[in-house]
Regions:
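N-terminal secretory signal peptides that target proteins for export/translocation
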Residues: 1-7
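Intrinsic low-complexity/disordered segments
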Residues: 3, 23-24
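Alpha-helical and His/Cys-centered functional microenvironments
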Residues: 7-10, 402
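Bacterial N-terminal signal peptides
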Residues: 10-21
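N-terminal maturation segment of proteins
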Residues: 26-569
Length: 569
């Protein structure tokens, strides 16, 4: 799609929408049909990752298929969907229809990003660890009691591992050495980990499945060890270039994340927020002089009990302070101990179960370790006060927003499109709750919030400079470890994850700033008639929508939208 045509298309969408003058209307049938077909295909083909906000429910009997022949078909389907979407008539569209169109455009271009820009199947050895161990991890996260159907799905996925790795070794024609390091790290002691996992499952799985699971485990371990040995042998000949480069990074920002800033602007925004977060952190330390330090919970049982009370208290706080509506149907976000069958693979991603569109009647769960001072960065904060993580991951953060978005009356808007709005909301509500006084009873916890703010500001620097080739993974990890500061393990995990996912680490800080810009514009436009609660309720229901599109839909503000497709100078 040429630059000129992109700008023409957006201007056409805006002009058509302004002519109809409607924000919400009956959902456009052609867009809804396209969305159903596209996301049904993505449920089969979307890669598994370590992230928790883009997990998808798979069809019964699903296994990944990355054979060379299937990759050719996937790339052709991208072209087919792209052509089909662009051919849909735009006559008489509402503003809502135009937003939905741009959402679907973003979703289709993400396929191109994965297959043709990042070239995950050809360049990323860790990709195949997530299509093997990662797909087991996703099933093991589900906290509701094990069923025969889920156990069968687990067995089916175990049995798919040898074929997936066989395809991986054929596909990896331009592998990156740094990504091989990540794969090798994730595969350490893999046979014993899988055995421990399956042995722990025995009490909750029917006895007639034990032998099949044990046999499939050994076959999977054989294949994984063979793959890891192959990687180690091939690594001296692998490329050392992992950065995506400026041109492709800007393509991601404009076409997929729908963020109307260039890399230099992002760096400036991150630097300004770093200055603010460090200053406010210093103010908080001064304010809290003489106060007792936060204590760690004595046990996970005590932490779980406290987190349950805190989650309920946060929900009441939201309503009492008129911050946003808490739907009566919304379930709870609880902590639980890490199950023994999950523990061996807990390094494969975020250890939570945020439920899904078909599980809105279930509680969400975050799995926690025993509390103590030697935990990694985020777990250590929760071991002192569960609320900062409850706010970001649970209520009113990810679980709260995603569950409400899954209940959106418009099916298109129930899907993940980009981390920007979701992580932006998760970060935004942290300071929102601080500013409303939630932490007045435990002042030291405000220091945790400001430490989180420091990290999110630095992530912008790390994301942009990894993408542009200005950081090595080790250099980015050292920068985070020394500057946040944070433990080495978490810093290295973050640097590795962000090297694999350009554009993800900026989403927290930039998404938050976009939300605050929208609120500022809304306050100026509506004056005393502006309702923060009303916007927050809209934001949560439409929380999967990039903020630039929210800005347009909520305020009819088109400046950000036009910037998306203007050539950066």
């Amino acid at each position: 799609m040429s630059q000129t045509f992109q700008i023409y298309l957006v201007r056409l969408l805006i002009a058509t929408t302004l002519f109809t003058g409607t924000m919400f209307s009956q959902h456009h049938p052609d867009l809804q049909e396209f969305s159903y077909d596209f996301f049904s295909w993505r449920a089969i083909t979307q890669p598994a990752t370590s992230d928790d906000i883009n997990r998808v429910e798979r069809p019964v009997g699903w296994v990944p298929d990355y054979s060379p022949e299937s990759l050719v078909k996937h790339k052709q389907r991208y072209q087919d969907f792209r052509s089909r979407l662009s051919s849909i008539s735009r006559q008489g569209w509402s503003r809502s229809d135009s937003v939905d169109y741009l959402l679907l455009h973003s979703a289709v271009e993400r396929v191109n990003w994965e297959l043709n820009v990042l070239r995950l199947p050809e360049r990323n050895p860790d990709f195949y660890i997530h299509q093997t161990l990662g797909i087991l991890f996703e099933l093991l996260l589900i906290h509701s009691p094990m069923t025969g159907q889920r156990a069968q799905e687990l067995l089916t996925r175990f049995r798919s591992i040898p074929k997936t790795l066989e395809h991986g070794m054929k596909n990896l024609n331009d592998p990156v050495s740094a990504f091989a390091d990540i794969a090798l790290s994730n595969g350490i002691n893999v046979r014993n980990k899988l055995r421990d996992c399956v042995n722990a499952l025995k009490p909750v799985v029917e006895p007639n499945m034990h032998r099949g699971l044990l046999n499939a485990t050994e076959d999977a371990a054989d294949a994984l060890e063979n793959y890891l040995n192959w990687l180690a042998d091939e690594q001296p000949r692998m490329s050392n270039r992992f950065s995506v480069g400026r041109e492709q990074y800007e393509y991601f920002l404009r076409q997929i994340a729908l963020i109307p800033y260039d890399p230099d602007q992002l760096l400036l925004m991150g630097a300004q927020e770093w200055d603010r977060s460090v200053s406010f952190y210093e103010y908080e330390l001064k304010r809290n002089e003489g106060l007792a330090e936060s204590r760690y919970f004595r046990s996970s049982k005590a932490q779980i009990a406290r987190s349950k009370r805190d989650e309920i208290s946060i929900r009441r706080f939201l309503e009492r302070k008129d911050i946003m509506s808490v739907p009566v149907w919304l379930q709870h976000y609880n902590n639980l101990p890490i199950p023994p069958w999950l523990a061996p693979l807990s390094h494969m991603g975020v250890n939570d179960d945020l439920t899904s569109e078909t599980r809105l009647n279930e509680n969400a769960v975050s799995y926690i370790p025993e509390p103590g001072p030697n935990l990694a960065y985020f777990n250590r904060s929760s071991a002192q006060d569960p609320r900062p993580i409850i706010i970001h991951e649970g209520v009113p953060g990810h679980y709260f927003q995603m569950a409400i978005s899954w209940a959106n009356k418009n099916p298109i808007r129930r899907h993940f499109f980009d981390s920007g709005p979701i992580e932006g909301i998760g970060f935004y509500v942290e300071e929102l709750m601080l500013q409303h006084g939630l932490f007045e009873d435990r002042p030291r916890s405000r220091e945790i919030i400001y430490s989180f703010m420091r990290l999110r500001a630095l992530r912008v620097d790390v994301d942009v400079k990894l993408a542009l080739g200005m950081y090595s993974i080790e250099g980015a990890a050292k920068f985070l470890e020394e500057t946040v500061p944070m433990d080495h393990e978490t810093a290295l995990w973050e640097a590795r994850f962000f090297s694999l996912t350009p554009g993800q680490a900026i989403s927290y800080q930039i998404g938050k700033l976009q939300i605050m810009s929208l609120i500022a514009d809304a306050r100026v436009e509506f004056g005393d008639n502006f309702s923060l609660r009303h916007y927050h309720d809209y934001m949560m229901e439409n929380g999967n929508i990039p903020i630039a599109l929210q800005h347009w839909e909520y305020l009819e503000e088109t400046n950000d939208l036009l910037k998306l497709w203007q050539k950066h100078k």
